[in-house]
């Protein structure tokens, strides 16, 4: 009993058969290798645009793995096809095959070669990993906040970052205090802006459940974990616009938590916008946006509109509001809310109802909708913090929606 | 050289008592009945889970949400699809195969603990009821991975709690079954059958059972904490109160990665049996196949955090990459050994063999994509995308389910005493193979291009691929009905199978089909080599079995011929 | 009744022994899991116990642990005595063991109820000790039932699987507790 390791051929090899087998093995081997390489050439067409330094490395690693994997696939399937053709039992042939139990040499070969392949892959992957991760903090840093179901990107204005034509004493007092404070003044945008060639770091924080920050074109992804701050970095090498996608199941709107393209080809939701250089970045994004918060409109309704457009709060994912181009389909429609809010609950004015709906959304559910809206709290440090000043402005704006 | 003892002159082999449907619906400690109960129940849930998959693919025909009422309803679809397929289809189905076959392969009358065996099965019934009850209480919607805080604070229905209790019951069932298998295999092998003389399916079940007993308790721990957080106000996973969401991820995956080997190792065992018998050739590299199963079982405990490459501490990514790469080696050994088994054999294209060949071609793709996923820089791009969905279905459907199908076609005659129609089987295979490939292969591409998983809403440029995938999935769904029809036809009017229609050497075939209550007529003596095809003595043994236990209805041209001359003995 | 075991009985005994061993190997993993959870949670805090939280008592649980270890000794002594046809020694040893076991549960119940509440520190303590207590109680009750049966003469020197099985299960309770004791009170 036990393993019989003798190869027991039941036919004589034809003369010169040995060298013929070797030739066939060499041919098959070459076919495998070239086939694998051929398969690997499709790599660019199954990846999104290669827009970061990291992407180049990842794609090359993948191309190599696809070549190796493709070769192995060709080997296995090639042998299968050969076996099916050459060793099929002819009709009526019920004899057994030869009693071959194994071949130690062959088994060692097909243990050692895969081990070597796997070792090579490990080393190569390690090298790519070392070069794409960063250890030191980077200047160009943006804070991203994920919440159900939208992304907000927070930029900082410090006295050093003031737009060219602005000086500190031009600013109103509360705003000047914010700018000169240790943390600087924040403004937020639905889109992430940076410029080409500059390594960028994004710090990641979630307001509620776990999310994941993924930019396919950059080949980078990092989970947002409740209770922790994580970060990701990348270096764009192509100017352009790139979709940002949430890649961790976060609830009913998980699929909505990604950049989309609106009817007018406008970018909605989370996109990465890479400007060709810092000058363009400042001119087309940073300075206009900074100016909006440094010199906010007097009219609270206009201020409210500005806040909502800035996407510090994830309202756009769930609500329809034509004035702002919102097409969310999870929560009630907000068109004409300025009028309707007064009629929703007897005893509550429109103003009171709107404030309540934002501070305590579960109180008066609209029939047909579930209790999914986050509660926007008034105390700094609590989840989904919305200061009273913002709330006032937003409610003022919503009250103007009377079409 | 051992042979079956000759019957006394004039003694007739008693016909097996025909079992009725009602025998399978009540408590029984007979491992054969329990095995069928497991397999029938599992198959029911396969259809249920498959129906959920059809709904998912229907929704994904368009990039917007237009089939399900809202995102929550859609999330429930894939949560239950995965939970049911993993815990109520594959794991119990493999347990069913094990239950039916292991005592027979070892020449035993039953498992070591028959009463415990029955208990393990009947735990599945309330578990399944709880899963279904979840639909009436706000079904679980956080994916089968149930990451908190989505599965705790943000899942308000009770379905998630029912889900956790159901999985508790299934875990206990699994552990009890595994204990039974280990003791049976260790203590109840017949005289002369050392570990290295037992069938590879038994090795596979042994390795699987070792994983189950060591890993499932971690699932129990994770589920207990989840339930406490949901109903008892604890804060294990609530960071605002000092908890940590990564505790769940680590504990959950410490079980759930070995779980995938629980799902595939028995399939590997089935492959070895089917390939050897239907290619009429010994298994190539028996020892390597046996030991690689154990190696995979043990190494499988070292890789779990590769499911967490984008959420774990970055410094730990590389060690888990290393362990995940290493586990490819024993798996590769198996594939090459199976190719070696086929090489030089006499391949019969029975449905069982077709599905085994399908396994070999599709599982290798899953294995290759698995190695790619082990590479951290690449995984970071494709983690939580359809690339992963593709990989997991290649190994779980292209692997485990194909192996299950092969096993069904192979052992159906033994269990029922009837043959499954071979032409229907070939049709089933063709539809399944084509449907499977075009459902799942394009998912690699759409994932790499930027489609995340677990979404009903996606970027419009992916619609073409999604339509192809969905149409192929509908074909895959339809293919199941061919099998159902074939099974019904066989039970009502199938050809009588006889004891050993495939002329196999393992001990389950050395008795009538179906076997009598005590499995064997007299004391069974195993043939010296469960894979000893190609020898004169094997031929004589098989003739003996045919003579003693009867041949079924055979087609005219399938008359056995004597073994090759000079083929070694 | 004191005759040699038949082949079938020996086979059943071998199966039961292997089965119990595998079960224990499996079940200790839940305790290992809770240990791991404890370690991972405490790794998130600068100090353990966290700021402002009182440490667990040391004296009473250590006393209880000593009692538990002693009970294991007595349970084993009882089994050996039974095998040596020393029925009286068996019964007395188990009486003492049951008393010690009950004392352990009583002390730990007191600890469980009196520990001041904190979100993580006391909660993980209570989950771990509570989980262990369930096992100590269930297996303790099994011990008591077997003891009761033994007093009625149910077991002898050759046929006493219930005694052997519950002895081993009680060892399991003790080993599991030692793991928890080290994690909760020493490390």
Q: What are the functions of these language-model segments?
A:
Chain A
Residues 333-351:
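Conserved P-loop NTPase catalytic core
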Residues 22-44, 71-78:
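Alpha-helical transmembrane segments of integral membrane proteins, especially early/N-terminal helices
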Residues 66-70:
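Alpha-helical transmembrane segments of polytopic membrane proteins
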Residues 3-20, 38-64, 77, 84-303, ...:
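Non-transmembrane, membrane-proximal soluble domains of secreted or membrane proteins
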Residues 61, 397-401:
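Aromatic- and Gly/Pro-enriched helix-to-coil junctions and flexible linker segments
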Residues 314-317, 327-337, 359-391:
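Axial heme c-ligation environment in periplasmic c-type cytochrome domains
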Residues 250-251, 318-325, 339, 378, ...:
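Detector for the c-type heme attachment site
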């Amino acid at each position: 009993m036990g393993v019989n390791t003798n190869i027991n051929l039941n036919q004589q090899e034809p003369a010169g058969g040995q060298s013929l087998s070797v030739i066939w093995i060499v041919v098959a081997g070459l076919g495998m290798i070239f086939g694998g390489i051929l398969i690997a050439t499709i790599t660019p067409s199954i990846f999104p645009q290669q827009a970061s330094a990291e992407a180049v490395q990842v794609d090359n690693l993948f191309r190599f793995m696809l070549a190796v994997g493709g070769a192995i696939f060709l080997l296995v399937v090639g042998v299968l096809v050969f076996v099916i053709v050459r060793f099929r039992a002819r009709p009526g042939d019920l004899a057994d095959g030869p009693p071959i139990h194994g071949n130690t040499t062959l088994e060692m070969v097909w243990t050692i070669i895969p081990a070597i392949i796997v070792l090579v892959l490990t080393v190569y992957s390690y090298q790519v990993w070392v070069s794409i991760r960063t250890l030191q903090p980077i200047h160009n840093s943006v804070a991203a906040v994920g919440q159900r179901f939208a992304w907000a990107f927070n930029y900082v204005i410090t006295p050093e970052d003031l737009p060219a034509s602005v000086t500190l004493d031009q600013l109103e007092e509360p705003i000047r205090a914010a700018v000169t404070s240790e943390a600087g003044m924040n403004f937020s945008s639905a889109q992430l802006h940076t410029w080409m060639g500059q390594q960028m770091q994004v710090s990641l924080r979630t307001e509620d459940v776990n999310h994941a920050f993924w930019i396919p074109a950059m080949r980078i992804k990092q989970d947002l974990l409740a209770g922790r701050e994580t970060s990701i970095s990348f270096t764009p090498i192509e100017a352009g616009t790139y979709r940002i996608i949430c890649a961790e199941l976060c609830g009913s709107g998980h699929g909505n938590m990604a950049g989309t393209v609106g009817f007018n080809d406008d970018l909605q939701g989370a996109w990465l916008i890479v400007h060709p250089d810092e000058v363009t970045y400042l001119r087309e994004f940073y300075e206009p946006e900074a100016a909006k918060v440094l010199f906010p409109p007097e009219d609270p309704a206009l201020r409210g509109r500005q806040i909502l457009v800035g996407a510090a709060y994830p309202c756009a994912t769930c609500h329809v509001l034509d004035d702002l181009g919102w097409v969310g389909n999870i929560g009630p429609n907000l068109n004409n809310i300025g009028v309707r809010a007064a009629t929703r609950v007897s005893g509550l004015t429109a103003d009171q109802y709107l404030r309540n709906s934002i501070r305590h959304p579960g109180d008066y559910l609209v029939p047909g909708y579930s209790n999914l809206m986050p509660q926007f709290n008034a105390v700094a440090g609590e989840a989904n913090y919305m200061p009273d000043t913002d709330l006032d402005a937003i409610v003022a704006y919503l009250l103007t929606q009377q079409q | 050289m051992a042979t079956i003892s000759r019957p006394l002159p004039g003694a007739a082999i008693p016909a097996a008592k025909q079992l009725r449907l009602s025998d399978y619906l009540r408590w029984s400690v007979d491992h054969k009945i329990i095995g069928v109960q497991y397999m029938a129940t599992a198959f029911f849930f396969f259809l249920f889970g498959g129906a959920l998959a059809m709904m998912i693919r229907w929704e994904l025909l368009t990039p917007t949400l237009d089939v399900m009422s809202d995102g929550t309803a859609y999330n429930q679809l894939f949560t239950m699809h995965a939970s049911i397929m993993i815990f109520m289809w594959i794991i119990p189905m493999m347990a069913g195969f094990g239950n039916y076959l292991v005592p027979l392969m070892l020449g035993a009358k039953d498992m070591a603990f028959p009463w415990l065996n029955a208990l393990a099965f009947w735990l599945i019934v309330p578990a399944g009821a709880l899963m279904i009850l979840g639909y009436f209480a706000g079904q679980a919607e956080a994916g089968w991975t149930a990451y908190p805080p989505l599965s705790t604070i943000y899942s308000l229905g009770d379905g998630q709690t029912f889900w956790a209790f159901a999985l508790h019951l299934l875990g206990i069932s699994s552990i009890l079954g595994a204990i039974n298998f280990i003791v049976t295999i260790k203590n109840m092998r017949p005289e002369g059958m050392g570990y290295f003389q037992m069938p590879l399916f038994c090795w596979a079940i042994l390795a699987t059972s070792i994983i189950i007993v060591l890993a499932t308790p971690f699932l129990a721990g994770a589920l207990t904490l989840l339930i406490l957080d949901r109903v008892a106000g604890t804060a294990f996973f609530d960071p605002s109160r000092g908890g940590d969401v990564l505790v769940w991820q680590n504990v959950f995956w410490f079980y759930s990665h070995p779980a995938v080997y629980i799902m595939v190792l028995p399939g590997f065992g089935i492959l070895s049996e089917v390939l050897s018998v239907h290619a009429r050739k010994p298994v190539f590299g028996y020892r390597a196949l046996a030991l690689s199963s154990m190696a995979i079982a043990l190494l499988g405990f070292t890789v779990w955090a590769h499911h967490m490459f984008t959420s774990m501490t970055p410094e730990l990514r590389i060690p888990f990459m290393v362990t995940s790469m290493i586990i490819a080696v024993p798996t590769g050994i198996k594939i090459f050994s199976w190719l070696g088994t086929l090489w030089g054999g006499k391949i019969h294209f029975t449905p069982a063999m077709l599905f085994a060949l399908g396994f070999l071609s599709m599982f290798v793709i899953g294995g290759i994509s698995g190695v790619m996923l082990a590479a951290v820089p690449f995984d970071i791009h494709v983690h939580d995308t359809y690339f992963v969905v593709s990989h997991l279905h290649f190994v779980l459907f292209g692997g485990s389910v194909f192996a299950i199908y092969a096993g069904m076609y192979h052992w159906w005659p033994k269990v029922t005493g009837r043959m499954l129609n071979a032409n229907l089987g070939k049709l089933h295979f063709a539809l399944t193979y084509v449907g499977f490939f075009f459902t799942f292969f394009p998912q690699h591409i759409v994932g790499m291009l930027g489609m995340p998983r677990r979404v009903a809403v996606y970027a419009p440029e992916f619609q073409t691929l999604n339509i192809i995938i969905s149409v192929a999935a509908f074909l895959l769904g339809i293919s199941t009905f061919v099998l159902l029809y074939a099974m019904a036809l066989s039970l009502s009017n199938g050809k009588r199978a006889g004891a050993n229609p495939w002329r196999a050497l393992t001990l389950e075939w050395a008795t009538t089909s179906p076997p009598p209550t005590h499995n064997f007529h007299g004391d069974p003596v195993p043939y010296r080599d469960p894979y000893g095809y190609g020898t004169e003595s094997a031929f004589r043994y098989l003739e003996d079995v045919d003579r003693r236990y009867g041949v079924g209805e055979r087609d005219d041209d399938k008359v056995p011929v004597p073994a090759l001359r000079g083929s070694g003995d | 009744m004191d005759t040699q075991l038949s082949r079938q009985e020996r086979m059943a005994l071998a199966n039961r022994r292997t089965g119990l061993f595998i079960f224990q190997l499996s079940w200790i993993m839940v305790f290992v899991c809770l240990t791991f959870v404890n370690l991972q949670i405490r790794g998130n805090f600068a100090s353990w116990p966290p700021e402002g939280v009182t440490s667990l008592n040391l004296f009473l649980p250590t006393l209880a642990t000593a009692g538990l270890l002693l009970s294991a000794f007595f349970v084993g002594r009882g089994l050996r005595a039974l095998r040596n046809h020393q029925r009286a020694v068996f019964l007395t040893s188990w009486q003492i063991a049951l008393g010690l076991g009950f004392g352990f549960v009583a002390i730990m119940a007191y600890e469980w109820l009196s520990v001041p509440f904190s979100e993580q520190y006391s909660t993980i303590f209570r989950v771990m000790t509570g989980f262990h207590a369930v096992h100590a109680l269930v297996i303790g009750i099994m011990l008591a039932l077997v003891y009761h049966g033994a007093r009625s003469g149910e077991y002898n020197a050759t046929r006493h699987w219930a005694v052997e099985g519950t002895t081993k299960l009680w060892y399991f309770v003790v080993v599991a507790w030692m793991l928890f004791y080290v994690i909760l009170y020493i490390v």
